[in-house]
């Protein structure tokens, strides 16, 4: 499961739909001001994935996180934060379903969402 926390770019949202489709994820939760289908710019980049990936809209990201946790999900924010686990060291031997929260392109994942998450995963990058 993927949770998008106030993503501003329609193209980024569409790319996540395509990735979710490719990995056969259980679904996506779009939160805050994250653009939602149907929209021409999302449809063009998503290439039909908005039809094959289940998605929901929840205004408040923290509500979405707490809802999934109440259903037994382990929730991890993808963010550089104190105590983050490098992706290469992340243990994926969970018996519970997993949800990843991706944050705004500038601000990242909201601090209250990080606090409510079961942890943070950091994806090392060579670029900026």
What are these regions (language model features)?
Residues 1-128:
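Post-transcriptional modification and biogenesis factors for structured RNAs
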């Amino acid at each position: 499961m993927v949770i998008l926390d106030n993503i501003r770019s329609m193209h980024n949202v569409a790319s996540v739909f395509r990735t979710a489709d490719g990995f056969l994820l259980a679904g996506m939760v779009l939160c805050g001001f994250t653009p939602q289908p149907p929209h021409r710019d999302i449809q063009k980049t998503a290439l039909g994935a908005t039809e094959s990936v289940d998605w929901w809209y929840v205004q408040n990201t923290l509500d979405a996180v707490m809802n999934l946790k109440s259903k037994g999900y382990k929730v991890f924010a993808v963010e550089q934060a104190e105590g983050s686990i490098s992706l290469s060291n992340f243990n994926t031997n969970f018996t519970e379903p997993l949800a990843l929260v991706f944050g705004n392109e500038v601000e990242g994942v909201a601090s209250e969402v990080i606090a409510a998450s079961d942890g943070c995963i950091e994806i090392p990058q060579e670029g900026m």
